[in-house]
C-alpha cells in the first residue's frame, strides 16, 4: 500500500509540475554560487537538444528550444562561462540539426520560404558592415544585432505551421516558465537581502533585478507571467499546479514592478489584452479568463500596488507616472537621421553608432528595433518589417478562433511591443515571435486524457535537460 501510494504521488501531475518549477530555485542559487555548474548546465542543455534533434524527437526539441530561451538571462546572471549570445546560437544550432535530421529521414521540404527571404533581405547591410569595419568589429556588430534574426529565421523554418496539441502546449510553456522561476528567485533574494541598502530611487534597479540588468530581467519576468496566465487557462484538472502557477505569476508581476524597468510590465498588459480579446468567442476559456482578470485586478489594485507603494515610500507611483523614455526617443531620432542619409541600403549593421554619438553623446546601442532596421537596412528594413508582419498575420488567421488565435496574438503583441523598447537583446524575443507561428490545436471540447500519462507532462528528469545537472 505505501509503495502504491508513493508511486501514485510520484505520478501526480500536480507534484511533477510543482517539482519541475520549484527545483529551479535551488538550482539558480547553486549556479550563482558556483559558476562551473552554470557552465556545465548551459553545455549539457545544448547537447541534450542536439541529441533530441538528431533522433527526430520533435516535442522534446520544442521543449528544449523553449527552455534555452527562458534560461539565457539566467546563464548570464550566474556568469556561466559561455559567450554572451550563447542562447541565440544554441537555439539556432538545435533547430538546424532538427531540420537536417527531419529532411534526412523523409522527403520533407520547407513549409515556407518567408524566413529565408527575411534573412536574405539582411545581406546588403551585412555586406556594408564587412566593408566598413575590421573583421573583429564587423563580427561583433553582426553578432550583437543579427544573432536574434539567425535564431528567428532558423526557428521559424522549423516551427512554421507545426501542430501543437494541448499537452504539448502545456509542456512548452512550463519549459519556458521554469528557468524564469529561477530568475524570479535570484531577483527576490537580492531584493530581500539588500533591502537596507536599496534606496528605491526612481530609476531601474540593479539590486531588485538580481544584481543584473533590469531591462532584461523585467522583460523575461513579463513573459514568464504571460506563460503563467496562459497555463492557468489551458491546464485541465491540475488544481494544485494551477494554484502554484498563479502564485508564481503574481510574484513575477510584483518583482517585475520592483525592477522599476517599465517596459516589461507594459508589454505584459498589452499581450494580456490581446489574449483576452481573442477568448471572447470561446465560452469555457472566456469564463476562466474573466475570473482570472477579476482576481488579478483585485489583488493588484487592492493589495499589491498599495503595499509596494508604501514599501517604496511612493517611489512606485513616481516611477510609473514618469514618462521619460530614458534616451530611447533621442536614439530613435538618431536612427531616423541615418535613414535620411542612406534611405536605400541603410548605413549597414552597426552604422548607426556615429549618429547615436552625435545625438546622444554616447556610444549606445539602439533600444528600438524598428528604427534600427530603418537606419542600418534602409528600404530592406521596411521589407523585413513587412515580412514579419505578414508572417504573423498569416499564422494568426491560420489558427482557429479561440485559444489558438489568443496565444498567437499574445506572443506576437508581446514581441512587437518589446522590440519597441528593448530591440532584440535576448533570445526570448525572437522565440516568442516564433511561438506565434505554431499551429495551436487546442480543442476546447477535448480534455487530453494523456496529460497524466506517458504522453502528457513529462517528469522533471525527462522533460528537459536542466534537472540532470544538480
Walk through the language-model features, giving the residues of each:
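N-terminal signal-anchor transmembrane segment
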Residues: 4-104, 123-131, 414-418, 429
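Membrane-interface helix-loop-helix junctions at transmembrane boundaries of multi-pass membrane enzymes
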Residues: 52-61, 102-114, 231-247, 282-290, ...
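Aromatic-anchored transmembrane helix interface
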Residues: 83-97, 112-128, 135-161, 174-185, ...
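Alpha-helical transmembrane segments of multi-pass inner-membrane proteins
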Residues: 126, 150-158, 168-202, 211-281, ...
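A membrane-periplasm/extracellular boundary helix in multi-pass inner-membrane enzymes
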Residues: 186-194, 254, 258-259, 276-320, ...
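Transmembrane alpha-helices of multi-pass inner-membrane enzymes
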Residues: 227, 406-417, 423-470
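Long extracytoplasmic/lumenal interhelical loops at the membrane interface
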Residues: 307-377, 396-399, 403
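Hydrophobic transmembrane alpha-helices and their immediate junctions
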Residues: 376-418, 448
Amino acid at each position: 500500500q505505501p509503495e502504491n501510494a508513493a508511486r501514485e504521488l510520484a505520478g501526480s501531475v500536480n507534484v511533477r509540475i510543482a517539482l519541475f518549477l520549484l527545483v529551479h530555485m535551488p538550482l539558480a542559487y547553486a549556479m550563482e554560487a558556483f559558476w562551473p555548474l552554470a557552465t556545465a548546465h548551459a553545455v549539457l542543455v545544448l547537447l541534450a537538444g542536439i541529441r533530441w534533434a538528431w533522433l527526430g524527437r520533435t516535442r522534446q526539441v520544442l521543449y528544449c528550444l523553449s527552455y534555452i530561451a527562458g534560461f539565457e538571462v539566467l546563464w548570464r546572471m550566474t556568469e556561466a562561462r559561455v559567450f554572451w549570445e550563447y542562447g541565440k546560437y544554441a537555439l539556432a544550432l538545435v533547430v538546424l540539426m532538427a531540420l537536417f535530421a527531419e529532411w534526412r529521414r523523409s522527403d520533407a521540404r520547407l513549409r515556407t520560404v518567408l524566413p529565408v527571404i527575411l534573412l536574405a533581405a539582411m545581406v546588403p547591410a551585412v555586406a556594408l558592415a564587412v566593408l566598413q569595419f575590421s573583421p573583429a568589429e564587423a563580427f561583433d556588430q553582426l553578432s550583437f544585432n543579427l544573432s536574434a534574426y539567425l535564431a528567428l529565421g532558423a526557428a521559424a523554418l522549423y516551427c512554421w505551421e507545426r501542430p501543437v496539441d494541448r499537452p504539448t502546449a502545456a509542456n512548452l510553456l512550463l519549459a519556458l516558465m521554469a528557468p524564469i522561476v529561477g530568475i524570479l528567485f535570484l531577483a527576490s533574494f537580492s531584493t530581500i537581502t539588500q533591502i537596507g541598502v536599496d534606496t528605491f530611487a526612481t530609476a531601474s534597479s540593479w539590486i531588485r533585478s538580481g544584481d543584473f540588468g533590469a531591462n532584461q530581467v523585467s522583460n523575461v519576468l513579463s513573459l514568464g507571467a504571460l506563460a503563467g496566465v496562459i497555463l492557468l487557462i489551458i491546464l485541465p484538472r491540475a488544481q494544485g499546479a494551477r494554484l502554484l502557477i498563479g502564485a508564481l505569476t503574481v510574484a513575477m508581476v510584483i518583482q517585475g514592478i520592483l525592477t522599476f524597468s517599465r517596459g516589461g510590465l507594459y508589454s505584459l498588459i498589452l499581450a494580456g489584452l490581446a489574449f483576452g480579446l481573442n477568448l471572447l468567442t470561446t465560452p469555457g476559456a472566456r469564463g476562466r479568463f474573466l475570473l482570472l482578470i477579476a482576481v488579478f485586478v483585485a489583488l493588484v489594485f487592492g493589495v499589491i500596488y498599495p503595499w509596494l507603494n508604501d514599501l517604496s515610500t511612493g517611489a512606485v507611483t513616481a516611477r510609473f507616472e514618469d514618462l521619460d523614455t530614458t534616451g530611447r526617443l533621442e536614439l530613435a531620432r538618431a536612427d531616423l537621421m541615418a535613414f535620411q542619409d542612406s534611405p536605400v541600403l541603410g548605413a549597414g549593421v552597426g552604422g548607426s553608432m556615429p549618429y547615436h554619438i552625435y545625438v546622444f553623446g554616447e556610444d549606445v546601442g539602439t533600444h528600438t528595433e524598428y528604427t534600427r532596421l530603418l537606419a542600418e537596412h534602409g528600404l530592406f528594413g521596411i521589407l523585413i518589417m513587412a515580412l514579419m508582419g505578414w508572417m504573423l498575420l498569416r499564422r494568426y488567421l491560420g489558427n482557429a478562433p479561440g485559444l489558438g488565435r489568443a496565444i498567437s496574438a499574445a506572443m506576437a503583441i508581446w514581441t512587437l511591443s518589446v522590440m519597441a523598447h528593448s530591440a532584440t537583446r535576448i533570445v526570448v524575443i525572437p522565440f516568442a515571435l516564433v511561438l506565434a507561428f505554431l499551429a495551436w490545436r487546442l480543442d476546447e471540447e477535448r480534455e487530453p486524457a494523456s496529460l497524466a500519462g506517458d504522453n502528457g507532462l513529462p517528469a522533471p528528469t525527462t522533460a528537459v535537460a536542466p534537472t540532470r545537472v544538480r
